[in-house]
């Protein structure tokens, strides 16, 4: 049997604990719409949102600058301070684990909640930051055009 090594989407040799602004996207497993609609989050969506809002209290100096919980994914701008002792993989991994644990407490038998890994982009300058901030801000309005939106009139994912 042949086993393949999955290529890491991270930049080789980059220190992901370094002081920077990061644009993060985390998708649900198979892009299932678990989190409700953008304007009315489900119970699972509320859990995902609450955990995002608590990140800064779990990690000293880390902050979530802008975020949106969408039906099947989450976008955020995560700011890591200088002298930070956690790397991005630890933070995102623990976030995903915490949300999964809470969801399984509500609905036992729930298997995978999240897609493997996550997407990241290192924000390079003010223009990059502004474009990403606007993208996150506009994401709920653009949901009705998404191929995973079942009802373009209401934006419902269910």
Residue ranges and their predicted role:
Residues 1-158:
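Short catalytic/metal-binding and nucleic-acid-binding patches
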